[in-house]
Amino acid sequence: MRILIVGAGGVGTAAVAIAARRDFFEHIVVADYDPARVEHALAQVTGDPRFSGARVDASDVASIVALIREHGVTHVLNAVDPRFVMPIFDACYEAGVDYMDMAMSLSRPHPDKPFELPGEKLGDRQFEMAS
């Protein structure tokens, strides 16, 4: 298993610390828009060749797909703000890799009758694409 963790904040850094104690994966790439956050997350696993870092714009599907392909990633863990769920999900779908997250796409109200009809509910788009 080759994992891309998108987001090197609190959740991504915690995922690195937990994964470092395990042997279920071959490699983990920790990626964030801010290289300093990547360095901070990787500081706890210095010398472990199973970890590497990269810079990524989580709003750019093409750059996420390129990173997935460059590192032979098989699974992506989304550890960023929910606003970036859909670009990361779309990149995984395009690249044909598994997507893991602690959330789903944000709900949106009905465009014409927000108080009368349901709009797009949490996760609707992902479930629709998966069927």
Regions found by a protein language model. Name each.
Residues 3-9:
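Conserved N-terminal Rossmann-fold NAD(P)-binding element of oxidoreductases
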Residues 12-15:
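N-terminal Rossmann-fold NAD(P) dinucleotide-binding loop
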Residues 19:
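Aromatic pocket-lining residues of Rossmann-like dinucleotide-binding sites
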Residues 26-29:
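Short beta-strand element of Class I
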Residues 33-37:
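Helix N-cap at the beta1-alpha1 junction of Rossmann-like dinucleotide-binding domains, i.e.
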Residues 51-53:
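Hydrophobic/aromatic anchor residues within beta-strands of the central parallel beta-sheet
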Residues 55-73, 80, 84-88:
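Conserved Rossmann-fold cofactor-binding substructure of NAD(P)-dependent oxidoreductases
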Residues 82-131:
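Glycine-/Pro-rich loop/turn segments that contact NAD(P) or position catalytic residues
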